[in-house]
């Protein structure tokens, strides 16, 4: 068996990636989220495949086909809710994975980090298109509002929006193409994940100390396979509790009303995982400015590599930057809350302050804190 594992052209790639891979001996549970994201992706592809067997991407029948899945298909309700809540678990793991990367300075592995940002954009685009497919009220109006943002692009904006819509409004053509893209994107994401792993294995994993761990490596199997298995078990437990006891807690009640272009819901909002970027978008009165802020709220992560001023890699021994980091986390929670609130006082001003704070902490305060810590610790 060992000979096949190490000699077979296909199996040896798996062996070098998941079995004999040298891994740091001190990586904590925060390093579990990579494998959990892989598990989430597999769950989403499998449940999505079975949903696609019964779903019809036509404005006349899309809503009723989802109803049919829940009522008439064997365990259709389970597949549907695992897929819907699986997306939420996917984003929870994604945010924790990115948060871990920021805390421990993983952004210094430039290729892996930038690939991760591309993956984040790809997953967000996929989730947005998936949110449109049930063709409920929030699906329709969410699609209308978000695609309309592209009209802010000078000269080509309006033409671009109508090209994406396939007409003069969100209609049958839009739904059909969104379904096609939503189906193909997870496979593109899988390919990007492999590139992400390829770049990661070029440098090796980071670790909580932020130091080079070449002198103290252990094989990935059995140590981290067992650890990842425990993480997977906990994730599946959390997902099943969500699916079986609170299936609609993260959804929107408006999406149980069929899409009606003549009736606008009182508060149009996307899925909870987009609320922080939605709050940043709404906090700028200018349409183009809002769109740019929305894109920059994710792209700013790519700047972190160049804004790193500290002589230490992670935040483990950097109390000032640590404080900034946890203020940033709190700020993101505030933005998520504001994104779900109506556009009125005092939410407008809170959103503006939180949006300014978000960019200020990342671009200005954290680099300054790094320089101060260098001086305090005399690391110049």
Swiss-Prot record:
SUPFAM superfamilies: a domain/subunit of cytochrome bc1 complex (Ubiquinol-cytochrome c reductase) (SSF81648), Transmembrane di-heme cytochromes (SSF81342). GO terms for cellular component: mitochondrial inner membrane; respiratory chain complex III. Heme b b566 binds at residues 97, 196. It is a multi-pass membrane protein. Pfam families: Cytochrom_B_C, Cytochrome_B. Keywords: Electron transport, Heme, Iron, Membrane, Metal-binding, Mitochondrion, Mitochondrion inner membrane, Respiratory chain, Transmembrane, Transmembrane helix, Transport, Ubiquinone. The keyword Transmembrane helix applies. It is found in: Mitochondrion inner membrane. It comes from the Eukaryota. Its cofactor is heme b. The chain crosses the membrane at residues 33-53, 77-98, 113-133, 178-198, 226-246, 288-308, 320-340, 347-367. Binds 2 heme b groups non-covalently. A ubiquinone binds at residue 201. GO terms for molecular function: metal ion binding; ubiquinol-cytochrome-c reductase activity. Heme b b562 binds at residues 83, 182. Component of the ubiquinol-cytochrome c reductase complex (complex III or cytochrome b-c1 complex) that is part of the mitochondrial respiratory chain. The b-c1 complex mediates electron transfer from ubiquinol to cytochrome c. Contributes to the generation of a proton gradient across the mitochondrial membrane that is then used for ATP synthesis. Heme 1 (or BL or b562) is low-potential and absorbs at about 562 nm, and heme 2 (or BH or b566) is high-potential and absorbs at about 566 nm. The cytochrome bc1 complex contains 11 subunits: 3 respiratory subunits (MT-CYB, CYC1 and UQCRFS1), 2 core proteins (UQCRC1 and UQCRC2) and 6 low-molecular weight proteins (UQCRH/QCR6, UQCRB/QCR7, UQCRQ/QCR8, UQCR10/QCR9, UQCR11/QCR10 and a cleavage product of UQCRFS1). This cytochrome bc1 complex then forms a dimer. This is Cytochrome b. It comes from Dicrostonyx torquatus (Arctic lemming). The gene is MT-CYB.
């Amino acid at each position: 068996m060992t000979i096949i594992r190490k000699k077979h052209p296909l199996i040896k790639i798996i062996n070098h990636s998941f079995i004999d891979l040298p891994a740091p001996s001190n990586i904590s549970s925060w390093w579990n989220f990579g494998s959990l994201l892989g598990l989430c992706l597999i769950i989403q592809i499998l449940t999505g495949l079975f949903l696609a067997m019964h779903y019809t991407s036509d404005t006349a029948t899309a809503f009723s086909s989802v109803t049919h899945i829940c009522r008439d298909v064997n365990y259709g309700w389970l597949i549907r809710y695992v897929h819907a809540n699986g997306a939420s678990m996917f984003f929870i793991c994604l945010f924790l994975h990115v948060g871990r990367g920021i805390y421990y300075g993983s952004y210094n592995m430039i290729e892996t980090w930038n690939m991760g940002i591309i993956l984040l954009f790809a997953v967000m685009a996929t989730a947005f298109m998936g949110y449109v497919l049930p063709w409920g009220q929030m699906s329709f109006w969410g699609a209308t509002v978000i695609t309309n943002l592209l009209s802010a692009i000078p000269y080509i904006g309006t033409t671009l929006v109508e090209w994406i819509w396939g007409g003069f409004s969100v209609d049958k053509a839009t739904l059909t193409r969104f379904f096609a893209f939503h189906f193909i994107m997870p496979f593109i994401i899988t390919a990007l994940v492999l590139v992400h792993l390829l770049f990661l294995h070029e440098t090796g994993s980071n670790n909580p100390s932020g130091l080079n761990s070449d002198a103290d490596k252990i094989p990935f199997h059995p140590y981290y396979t067992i650890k990842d298995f425990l993480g997977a078990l906990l994730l599946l437990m959390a997902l099943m509790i969500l699916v079986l006891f609170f299936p609609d807690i993260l959804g929107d009640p408006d999406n149980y009303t069929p899409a009606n272009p003549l009736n606008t819901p009182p508060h149009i909002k996307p899925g909870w995982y987009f609320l922080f970027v939605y709050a940043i978008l709404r906090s700028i009165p200018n349409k183009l400015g809002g769109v740019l802020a929305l894109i920059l709220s994710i792209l700013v992560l790519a700047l972190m590599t160049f804004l790193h001023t500290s002589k230490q890699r992670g935040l483990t021994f950097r109390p000032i930057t640590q404080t900034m980091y946890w203020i940033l986390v709190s700020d993101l929670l505030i933005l998520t809350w504001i994104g779900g609130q109506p556009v009125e006082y005092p939410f407008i001003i809170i959103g503006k302050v939180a949006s300014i704070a978000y960019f200020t902490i990342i671009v200005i305060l954290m680099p300054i804190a790094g320089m101060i810590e260098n001086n305090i610790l005399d690391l110049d």
